[in-house]
UniProtKB/Swiss-Prot annotation:
Mitochondrial membrane carrier protein that mediates the import of NAD(+) into mitochondria. Mitochondrial NAD(+) is required for glycolysis and mitochondrial respiration. Compared to SLC25A52, SLC25A51-mediated transport is essential for the import of NAD(+) in mitochondria. The transport mechanism, uniport or antiport, its electrogenicity and substrate selectivity, remain to be elucidated. GO terms for biological process: aerobic electron transport chain; mitochondrial NAD transmembrane transport; NADP biosynthetic process. It comes from the Eukaryota. Residues 1-21 are annotated as: Disordered. Keywords: Membrane, Mitochondrion, Mitochondrion inner membrane, Repeat, Transmembrane, Transmembrane helix, Transport. Belongs to the mitochondrial carrier (TC 2.A.29) family. GO terms for molecular function: NAD transmembrane transporter activity; organic anion transmembrane transporter activity. PROSITE patterns: SOLCAR. SUPFAM superfamilies: Mitochondrial carrier. The chain crosses the membrane at residues 36-56, 85-105, 119-139, 180-200, 216-236, 269-290. Pfam families: Mito_carr. The gene is Slc25a51. It comes from Mus musculus. This is Mitochondrial nicotinamide adenine dinucleotide transporter SLC25A51.
Length: 298
């Protein structure tokens, strides 16, 4: 009953994905996209953090899922959510910027470069939003250190981890920024570019619940595919960011080292990718569905 009443009151928001997006970019001063992105990220991190921790151990050490789970069990329940503050701060801010800047930049580019195709302006907006997110690299950096059990005896919380990096200079906070730029920039272009077409290929939603399911499927499928494609980049990033001090090695050099360590086998490089696929499916399903749902009620 509530679904049908809502449908009668707000018909433009429950038709096609093109119609869904158009009213959301009403003005640069509109902050609801930032707020909805923030809340969607908070919801996602709180639910999926333990799975992310298992995945991280696999990426860093190339171990099997069972061994990663045993490591977490050995660490104890009190350490299960250890390190959640950096990803919570980083993810909420990152997704607020991702969705908010994308909408604002899309509008600005379309307004000032009206001769360019909409696909081009939206792609540039997605790329710029993704690269801007990289300013939050220090949070991802500290998250990596807190999740690595080798550093458990060096610091016990986020503040101590940030403090441990301070003596190495500001550049140490941004170690691993290059793979993050690649991942975020091109990932955003594909995510925002394919989100509309995928949603349009799904059955037309006529109720809030059906709309929520479509948004979950759309975000989940995109997140799973993009997460799988970017998995090797995240493996390299985890290795780079697990180091404190020392020389700053290039992305190709670190990749070569990992490739040799894992017997030059592609399957070993993707160890943990199946878990990442399912985690991304759930995470981005939650993010996209929460974001779109909040847009309708804010």
């Amino acid at each position: 009953m509530m679904d049908s009443e809502a449908h009668e009151k707000r018909p433009p928001m429950l038709t096609s994905s093109n119609q869904d997006l158009s009213p959301h970019i009403a003005g640069v001063g509109d902050m609801k996209h930032y707020l909805c992105g923030y809340c969607a990220a908070f919801n996602n991190v709180a639910i999926t953090y333990p799975v992310q921790k298992i995945l991280f151990r696999q990426q860093l050490y190339g171990i099997k899922t069972r061994d990663a789970v045993l490591q977490l069990r050995k660490d104890g329940f009190r350490n299960l959510y250890r390190g959640i503050l950096p990803p919570l701060m980083q993810k909420t801010t990152t997704l607020a910027l991702m969705f908010g800047l994308y909408e604002d930049l899309s509008r600005l580019l379309h307004k000032h470069v009206s001769s360019a195709p909409e696909f081009a302006t939206r792609s540039v907006a997605a790329l710029l939003a993704g690269t801007t997110e990289a300013i939050l690299t220090p949070f991802e950096r500290v998250q990596t250190l807190l999740q690595d059990h080798k550093h458990h005896d060096k610091f016990t919380n986020t503040y101590q981890a940030f403090r441990a990096l301070r003596c190495h200079g500001i550049a140490e906070y941004y170690r691993g920024m290059v793979p993050i730029l690649f991942r975020n920039g091109f990932g955003n272009v594909l995510f925002f570019g394919l989100r509309g077409p995928i949603k349009e290929s799904l059955p037309t939603a006529t109720t809030y619940s059906a709309h929520l399911v479509n948004d979950f499927i759309c975000g989940g499928v995109l997140g799973a595919v993009l997460g799988f494609l970017s998995f090797p980049i995240n493996v390299v990033k985890a290795r780079i960011q697990s180091q404190i001090g020392g020389p700053f090695l290039s992305l190709p050099m670190v990749f070569k080292t990992i490739w040799i360590e894992r017997d030059r086998k592609l399957i070993n490089l993707f160890r943990g990718a199946h878990l990442n696929y399912h985690r991304s499916l759930i995470s981005w399903g939650i993010i996209n569905a929460t974001y779109e749902f909040l847009l309708k009620i804010v």
